[in-house]
Structures are given as structure tokens and as C-alpha cells.
């Protein structure tokens, strides 16, 4: 399929039959599924499900990330038609990828929300697929990890973030995006000894055994060494990547609820992710994209690129196992 075929393609999210292959249609028209994948709730034959969780009722400061999944999907339409740069293969040709749509939930019943998230991801995993989740605020990580831990055991987590999200909070009924890693460790769904946080640049009294490569260290060491250390920490176990967009400096991702200066440049994040090729990635997310503060759309574009890199990593793992 060539670029000129765009004149004949529209609404592939509803009309395309094949879960594999490039989708060539005008970026400014049609239904904006992620990468113009097919929207479906049928996970038969799906290798990887992209899904949105438009929730921001756990934020501490500025809301708006409930609009993140929609913005990331729209920004994904700007991805090049060519294979993703720097990977040497095209995951869209090798993986059956579907857009599983957004998770349904009653916004007025927040007490039910964590369980709904776990059930949602559990359904994807039970079908034999992996998940890439578009947030939404970062609280969703804890209930996502519950589903993954049921299948794989306590999860090594690679967390890109400006904040540790380890505020002590033993009230498991509270919903707060600054506490979800604390709760993930305390409930045994995250493995702190094999987890690492990259890009941190806010204080934390107790990292609960999680290793940290803070933002100054990233700038000093360079992406290749950061990736080497991350790989050494997580080893060969099935692992999960959670990418809070505020890991990036506000110059590259201003549209987020809790921006912190001194963060990663987009090129650093891209290089680290690509240098992680070969880790045993079984799922991931990109969270905290907040379109109301994203006046140029740059943050949504960054979020779409991160999601694409997660897809590339997921596919690379399966190529190595084939």
C-alpha cells in the first residue's frame, strides 16, 4: 500500500479486516483509533491490545488527563507510514494489534474503579494478548499490576517519572496518583528488588528497595549506560514499563498535571527505550498526558511516540522468542 492509496482509505478503525499491516489514510480524517488499528472487543488472534483508561480523579494538582487517551490516539495519526525509525523491523507487520477502545466505568463510583481496571486488563491477558494502556492518571498502574501479577507473579517495573509515587499510604481505599507504587510494593504486585525508576527529580524519604536513576544521573551517564543498568536490574523476568509523561522535561511535554523542570529530553527517552530492546516486556502504559495544558499538541505527540516504542519493545521480545 502506497501513500497515494490514502484517497481510497478512510475509517479503517471500523472497516479494516486484517490486524496486521500499515494503515494508509489521511491523518486529518477518519476515526482516530491508535495507529488506525481496528477497534474491536474481539481479542481472538490479537497479540497486543491498545486500550484507554480516561480517568483523572486521583490527581493531586491539575486535572485533564482523562482526555489523554483521545489526544494520544489523534496524535498517533501523525506517525510516519514508514517502519518506526531505528528498529530495523515493523511491528505492525509482525504483530496483530487492535485498539480495544476505552474502559467503561461509572465516574461517580470511584470505589469501584480499581477493580474495574484489574478486570479490564485481566480480560486482555486471559485472551493471550499483552496490553499497552493510554492514561489517564498514574493511579491506574496499581490495579493494572494486580492483573499482571496474577499471571506472572510480582512484577519488575521500569518506571519513567519525575516523581517516585511512593508517598506512604496504607489506606488501600484511597485513590491517589502519588501513592500507587507504594501500594503496588506493599501489596506484593511489584517486585522492588527488580524495579527501577528513571528520571526522578523530586524528593522521596524511602524508595522501598527500588533502585533509582534520577534525572541528573541520566544526563551524566547517557542513554546507553542508563539502559544497561536498567537491563541489569530487571534481568530476564517478564517486566512492565510505566511511562509518566512528566519524566520528560516540560520543554518537551508541557501538557501534564505535575510538571518538573530538569527532566529528560525526548531524544534521551527514545534512546533509552530503544536500548532496552531484548528485555522481556509483557506490557506497558503511558500516562498523565493532559491536553488542556498541551497548547501545541507536543505532549500528545510524545505520548504517541512512547506508546509506539513500547509496541516495538513488545514485538522485539516476541521476535527473540520465535
Regions found by a protein language model. Give the residues of each.
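Conserved alpha-helical scaffold segments that buttress catalytic/binding sites
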Residues: 2-322
Amino acid at each position: 500500500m502506497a501513500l497515494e492509496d490514502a484517497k481510497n482509505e478512510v475509517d479503517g478503525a471500523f472497516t479494516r479486516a486484517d490486524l496486521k499491516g500499515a494503515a494508509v489514510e489521511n491523518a486529518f480524517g477518519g476515526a482516530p483509533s491508535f495507529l488506525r488499528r481496528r477497534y474491536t472487543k474481539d481479542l481472538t488472534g490479537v497479540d497486543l491490545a491498545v486500550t484507554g483508561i480516561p480517568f483523572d480523579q486521583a490527581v493531586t494538582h491539575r486535572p485533564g488527563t482523562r482526555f489523554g487517551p483521545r489526544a494520544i490516539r489523534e496524535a498517533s495519526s501523525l506517525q510516519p507510514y514508514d517502519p518506526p525509525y531505528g528498529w530495523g523491523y515493523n511491528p505492525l507487520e509482525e504483530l496483530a494489534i487492535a485498539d480495544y477502545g476505552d474502559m467503561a466505568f461509572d465516574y461517580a463510583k470511584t470505589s469501584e474503579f480499581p477493580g474495574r481496571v484489574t478486570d479490564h486488563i485481566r480480560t486482555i491477558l486471559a485472551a493471550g494478548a499483552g496490553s499497552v494502556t493510554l492514561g489517564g492518571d498514574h493511579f491506574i498502574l496499581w490495579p493494572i499490576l494486580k492483573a499482571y501479577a496474577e499471571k506472572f507473579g510480582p512484577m519488575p517495573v521500569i518506571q519513567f517519572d519525575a516523581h517516585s509515587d511512593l508517598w506512604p499510604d496504607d489506606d488501600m481505599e484511597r485513590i491517589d496518583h502519588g501513592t500507587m507504587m507504594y501500594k503496588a510494593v506493599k501489596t506484593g504486585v511489584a517486585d522492588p528488588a527488580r524495579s527501577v525508576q528513571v528520571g526522578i527529580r523530586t524528593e522521596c524519604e524511602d524508595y522501598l528497595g527500588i533502585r533509582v536513576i534520577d534525572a541528573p544521573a541520566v544526563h551524566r551517564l547517557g542513554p546507553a549506560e542508563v539502559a544497561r543498568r536498567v537491563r541489569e536490574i530487571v534481568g530476564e523476568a517478564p517486566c512492565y514499563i510505566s511511562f509518566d509523561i512528566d519524566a520528560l522535561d516540560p520543554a518537551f511535554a508541557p501538557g501534564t498535571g505535575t510538571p518538573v523542570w530538569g527532566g529528560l529530553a525526548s531524544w534521551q527517552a527514545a534512546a533509552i527505550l530503544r536500548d532496552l530492546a531484548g528485555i522481556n516486556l509483557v506490557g506497558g502504559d503511558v500516562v498523565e498526558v493532559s491536553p488542556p495544558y498541551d497548547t501545541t499538541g507536543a505532549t500528545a505527540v510524545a505520548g504517541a511516540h512512547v506508546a509506539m516504542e513500547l509496541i516495538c519493545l513488545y514485538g522485539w521480545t516476541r521476535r527473540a522468542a520465535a
